[in-house]
Amino acid sequence: MTPMALNREYITFGEAARHARRIFGTMVKPAGSACNLDCAYCYYLDKAAIYGGREPRMDFDLLERYIQQYIEGTDADTVTFVWHGGEPLIAGYDWFVRAMELQQRYAAGKHIVNTLQTNGTLVDERWCDLFRANNFLIGVSLDGPQDIHDAFRRDRLGKGTFDRVMETVDMMRRHGVEYNILATVNARSAGRGAEVYRFLRSVTDFIQFLPVSEHVIMEQGAARPHIVPPATEGAVPAPWSISAAAFGEFMCDVFDVWVREDVGRCFVQLFDATLANYMNVPPGVCSMCETCGETLVVEHNGDVYPCDHFVYPEFLLGNIGHDTLRDIFGSERQLQFGLAKRNTLPRECLRCQYRPLCHGECPKHRFAVSKSGDAGLNALCAGYKLFFRHTQPYMERMRHLLVKQQPPAAIMPWARRQPMRKGL
């Protein structure tokens, strides 16, 4: 939901409803949680249990209903479809051809944008032609050099996927497919921020670093830990999670290379979002907004949830078989979910000087306890504080450059004169 000029520490549903516009996004799971890989840290594989473990795929009638509802329901002139999983390509090539046809049927003058997140192992020449013809932006999951990537991103035979992903990246380059990289920051990445960044910038010019910080329980007889909502009693940090300190160090190390060598040439989502919050403009990523809830998640059977990190039965909002996306987005439950990002911050966050930069970050990470004993502190808080403290003089200088209508890249000569962190 759009940040509002309300300065109190609590926003009510009525206030939000009066300010809200029906501009929303969707993330759709055409094949649910189905995936050809078995990544250790995947937060979505568990969702198969909600739907009885069946091999799911959204049928064509429901696909048409979804596309029509979304285009007609949002007040936005540009409608962005986010195809996600699991692995969305499991839905099949013909399924996506049909989706493109339906988008054009119902576009009604609106601009249609398609983005798709993939593990990169099922893409072939035919897929590349489809992506290029329909101007897809493809997000490819790649965690870094081979030993880091293959530590957790393996197929169902236990084999690493690095070589297949790199072949896909080369194929998309040849076909002129626009792509970027999503890299998780996990226990194996710790201490290797500069190395990971230098590798990834050789592959792409846009990187999203996603911290892996999960709360899990081990159920009797289960093959893997079960990722649970933040407030679950008895849950513990997952073994693949990165610590707050290690995450902060990782991002500081990435930043120190980037700010000296790559401003304006390579784009790192966290850096862009942080600078945007310094400029008091929308950060472009929900985790760094004051409130959330702008993007509904649509499962393969039409079930709708407020966020793909909160696909649990207790968060189910409705189903497009009998509800409309527009009504679900405007419902009190959805608005309350988005407002809770701000309204449930612990006292430590309310007093924090960095609150305007992170707004408590993603609610899925809020399973720590503050020094004063308040529940709901972000488990990565110390790491974000380290990052914000370290980058503050650089961010303030880039903000000053932007105010003077100069490019942020002009900071690099000054940045190179600043002392480097050890080991870089």
Name the predicted role of every residue range.
Residues 147-152, 208-244, 266-279, 305, ...:
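Flexible glycine/acidic-rich beta-alpha junction loops that bind and position SAM and/or redox cofactors
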Residues 65-84, 337, 376-423:
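Short Fe-S-cluster ligation motifs
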Residues 34-46, 306-309, 346-364, 383:
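Local cysteine-cluster metal-coordination motifs and their immediate loop/turn environment
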Residues 1-28:
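N-terminal [4Fe-4S]-dependent radical SAM core
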Residues 21-61:
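Canonical Radical SAM [4Fe-4S] cluster-binding loop centered on the CxxxCxxC motif
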Residues 289-292:
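Short, small/polar residue-rich loop motifs at catalytic or cofactor-binding pockets
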Residues 243-278, 309-353:
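C-terminal accessory region of radical SAM enzymes
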Residues 67-82, 91-229:
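Radical SAM/AdoMet-radical enzyme domain recognition
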